[in-house]
Amino acid sequence: MRWSPPLRLRGSGPGWAAQEPTWREARPGLVAGALKRATTRPSGNWYVVGASRDVRVGERPYGRTVGGTEVVLWRTQGGGLRAGSGVCPHLGAPLRDSRVVCGTLVCHWHGLALDGAPFAGWQPFPVHDDGLLVWVRLDEVGGEKPTDRPVVPVRPARGGAVDAVFTAVGRCEPQDVVANRLDPWHGSWFHPYSFIDLSVVREPEGDGDDAFVVDVSFRVAGRLVVPVRAEFTAPGPRTVVMRITDGEGASSVVETHATPLTRPDHERPRTAVVEATVAASDRPGFALARAVAPVLRPLMRRTAGRLWVDDLAYAERRWALRSTGRFPG
């Protein structure tokens, strides 16, 4: 196979103000249709609560509120994952602030000990660790037919990839986050520091081929760019996956998971964005990137964080307009 450089030197293309407007292509009905199909797909009541690395053996428990339900997670001495109500059944202590002793969760108020089995009114929740993200099944929150496992997107093999997980919280609902990701046309206008020369080459055609296909160049520095083709799909009601299908890093994915923190009827909803990036490459030099993955992960999170400053503003604005009957889409 002929070698090609991973970076390209972009020619004198149009600047931000001179690029082709995309508002005609970004038809509100098209985005709304893709969103409706996504949000009606089953989830089995599974919610992403964080990165697998957030819950470690021998460390303090990890807490998250999902749909108004407090959840606590911890690991046994053998690395097994446990999850359940974050409220102590004795007097309501926040178990996320308790301690793990020899794999047992011990309440810091009165010493009630939980090994993960039902006890004294405390109930465990089904939990799944896919190797990168941790999922909890909350049947009362989801209200769907439960499934044994969540729908985990196909990812590059972990041994040949570098991954990072970024988390942020916004004042909006999950659908506002999903709608943002199902609007690829905003990329080079709203994020000119990261994307350029973006064009949507194929729109969704329904459930049989429900994907946006996008040609875009990622900015590296100055005129140096990485051109790729990417596909956006929504395998579940709170998940959007961007997968590079052609170009540098083919098979790499960015999974965006939107987890509601508040009840569905909350006047000021809050949603956690948990975004997992799994980068892969068949170039021999990528082995070096894997070797220094601990150094790269903070940089990957910083890149995601910069984008989500803007995208959460988009999602929060969308919710603010929807909640007051002013959203034009």
Where are these regions (language model features)?
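Rieske [2Fe-2S] iron-sulfur-binding domain
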Residues: 50-155
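Short beta-strand-initiation
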Residues: 44, 57-59, 69, 122, ...
